[in-house]
């Protein structure tokens, strides 16, 4: 159990190191307004903190830097949110100012603005298409035996799918088909369309379209549930180059190589808990990230988690600021998506 004096010294060391990236010595601490102890007391307390594993000495300096254990204690017990500036809030609110809300643009903009505000790398995992509901479908003939189905979801996502008809289909039948699909499938989750067609829509096709069986077969391949593609949006991929810890080219190259592998990036989100989650240094699953911290946050529709945001930075990350930004952005995203999904 750390004493109040040790807690204060640890907090000041970490806050100073976050800002300066320079080892912190007793002389630096003695100049801090909140530190009122003698230099001898500071040195003794620092020695105890080092012995306990919360700070460590670097080879090139007499000062101390936080250890992973120190950062973990700081995050778990000493972290307090910071008040965001008007500039911060204006930038965040600009994400949602578009009159026409489009899922992909909004998520992409969130990634970019978070990277701008933190100067770290941001990754946003957007909702999968299966989380969307069909709002409208149009079918546009492009050849006698081919058409394009235009699917619009409740979140503004637009997807084109090709329909290959086995024989010439009458335009009047296509019009009937569109009316039936819109009437029976509007509001149905995208990954349930195929099932609904063969359980329910088939009855209406049989009643109203002569060669319904050939059209039904065409719909089977068109609306077959695709794999749930999880879409990633990045901001500031090379921001790590601005951090002193990553002036080592080999270190940053291995990290950038990891970020380019989509499946590896997706794994970063797999163990994310609801809300805010923080992994520090070797707590991360990849060796390439042992000098990094990863902060993830989830956003929801009502209480259902539909996406996540990750910020990757050095272990010397400004945790308070990043957590405050993520809380604000995920709250706004949750409200925006909830209003869309409830329409």
UniProtKB/Swiss-Prot annotation:
GO terms for biological process: negative regulation of DNA-templated transcription. The gene is hrcA. InterPro entries: GAF-like_dom_sf, HrcA, HrcA_C, WH-like_DNA-bd_sf, WH_DNA-bd_sf, WHTH_transcript_rep_HrcA_IDD. PANTHER family: HEAT-INDUCIBLE TRANSCRIPTION REPRESSOR HRCA. Belongs to the HrcA family. GO terms for molecular function: DNA binding. Negative regulator of class I heat shock genes (grpE-dnaK-dnaJ and groELS operons). Prevents heat-shock induction of these operons. Keywords: Repressor, Stress response, Transcription, Transcription regulation. The lineage of its organism: Bacteria, Bacillati, Bacillota, Bacilli, Bacillales. This is Heat-inducible transcription repressor HrcA.
């Amino acid at each position: 159990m750390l004493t109040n004096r040790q807690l204060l010294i640890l907090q000041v060391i970490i806050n100073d190191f976050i800002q300066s990236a320079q080892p912190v010595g007793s002389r630096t601490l003695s100049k801090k307004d909140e530190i009122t102890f003698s230099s001898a007391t500071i040195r003794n307390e620092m020695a105890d903190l080092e012995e306990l594993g919360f700070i460590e000495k670097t080879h090139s300096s007499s000062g101390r830097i936080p250890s992973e254990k120190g950062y973990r204690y700081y995050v778990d017990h000493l972290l307090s949110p910071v008040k965001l500036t008007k500039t911060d809030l204006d930038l965040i609110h600009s994400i949602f100012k578009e009159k026409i809300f489009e899922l992909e643009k909004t998520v992409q903009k969130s990634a970019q603005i978070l990277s701008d505000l933190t100067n770290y790398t941001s990754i946003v995992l957007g909702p999968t298409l299966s989380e969307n509901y069909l709002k409208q479908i149009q079918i546009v003939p492009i050849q006698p035996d081919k058409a394009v189905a235009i699917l619009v979801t409740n979140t503004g996502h637009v997807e084109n799918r090709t329909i290959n008809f086995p024989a010439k289909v009458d335009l009047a039948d296509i019009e009937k088909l569109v009316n039936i699909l819109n009437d029976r499938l509007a509001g149905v989750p995208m990954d349930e369309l195929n099932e609904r067609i063969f359980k329910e829509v088939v009855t209406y096709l049989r009643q109203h379209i002569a060669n319904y069986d050939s059209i039904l077969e065409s719909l089977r391949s068109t609306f077959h549930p695709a794999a749930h593609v999880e879409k990633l949006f990045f901001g500031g991929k090379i921001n790590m180059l601005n951090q002193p810890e990553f002036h080592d080219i080999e270190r940053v190259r291995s990290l950038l190589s990891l970020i380019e592998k989509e499946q590896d990036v997706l794994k970063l989100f797999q163990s994310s808990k609801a809300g805010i989650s923080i992994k520090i240094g070797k707590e991360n699953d990849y060796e390439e990230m042992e000098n990094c911290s990863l902060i993830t946050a989830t956003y929801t529709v009502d209480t259902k988690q539909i996406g996540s945001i990750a910020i990757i930075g050095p272990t010397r990350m400004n945790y308070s600021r990043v957590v405050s930004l993520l809380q604000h952005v995920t709250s706004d995203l949750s409200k925006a998506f909830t209003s869309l999904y409830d329409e």
